[in-house]
């Protein structure tokens, strides 16, 4: 029996030593971990959802068709986004944004950006992001003043691979009232229909902010009275001898009664960069934010009118290789909003009406509904 008791004693002693050793090791590792500081990371979420009714071919806020049938009513999760931003150092940062898109019922990578930001005048971005383009493309559906900014086909007409984004590298900097943005991107080189894929797309934008500045790479469609803004922008892109350019303007002024009036306009011209047939178009938008607080928010009214003209052209039939004459076509779009602004773009809800008429197709679309946007 004695050998067994001795073995038990040694076993208990060995077990005790093992526990003590593990405890000491844990404490040491814990002390090491306590000294490690992870890079700062922020996580955010954005949601857009709607209840709608349309006569035919309901349209998403990104301009794609929602439903092809007539007299459609329903609810839609238009979009949900996940935002992740982190800093490697004070000057090297990373952005990663994803989106579930209700128009495709799929999740895609919106932005994947390595951001090298050294000063107001010198910054380099590389990866997937919005190239220098029109103001509307650079604010997108979550920071637009209206609910369906791309339904007219005028705004955001530049080539892209994911909601206006493209893969490439860009420089941007601020010089007083002038912001300069320029870059090189894949563009149409991702499109198998383009014969010459050896040339990349070049893009550039100049923005003049005569009143308050707009810091950073991106823009807003409105600042809900937080800024007095008078901005003028010129953007252009070129690839394979095809060009597209636009001129845009935004004016926002807080009035003596603390209400805010906003006026936005854009003219665009596409010489075959994104469409076989050259086209041009324009839109004008005006909104007024009432100063009175109604409950937890303020009332805003908005109206927008746009017209896009697809030029007459001789296009090649891909099957027969014959040239087919296409007549000029005009597409006219009207949008009306009555919005309830709770916390700028982080919490807003609104009624919208969208009407669109196509002269050549001799069709008209009418859509109205309620939209909700939340961000954190």
Model-derived features: positions:
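Bacterial N-terminal signal peptides
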Residues: 17-28
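N-terminal secretory signal peptides that target proteins for export/translocation
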Residues: 1-12
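Sec/Tat signal peptide C-region and signal peptidase I cleavage site
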Residues: 28-34
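Short amphipathic alpha-helical segment that frequently serves as the phosphate-/nucleotide-binding helix
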Residues: 64, 79, 246
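Short, structured loop/turn "capping" segments at alpha-beta junctions
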Residues: 214-217, 259-261
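Hydrophobic alpha-helical segments, especially transmembrane helices
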Residues: 13-14, 29, 129, 349
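Outer-membrane beta-barrel pore domains
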Residues: 5, 38, 68-70, 113-117, ...
